[in-house]
Amino acid sequence: KDLYEGIYKKIGIPIVFDYHHHQFCTGGMSEQEALEMALSTWGDIKPVTHYSESRRDEQEDMRIRVQAHSDYVYDKIEMYGNDFDIMIEAKAKELAVKRYNELHIKNNNKGIYIGLKRPKMESKNILHQRY
């Protein structure tokens, strides 16, 4: 909410929604509300979001900072019926993307693709690996 009022409304820069960071600074909004507000700032450009999970939860070690990124992404990413690209932030990089596909996208040509060029396909829901 602060980014929308303080940045987007003043200078028009689109907001990149970050699922993990939203857990720590909700602005009084649900995940879906914050996501859709961020998506509304992109105009005619396909929106981009960031997705990561907590290393503390992954390792089940309370000594690890909750903000630290996990090696892999385990939960299915909720898009709430919207169309946007997702950048996966995970320590295992391409292996994290591969494992996500194996867990959630099996036998579905709408998986996560790695690299700068998008493959030609019907779906526009393509997730990118962050470099």
Where are these regions (language model features)?
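Acidic/histidine-rich catalytic cores of soluble enzymes
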Residues: 1-47
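C-terminal accessory extensions appended to soluble enzyme cores
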Residues: 52-131
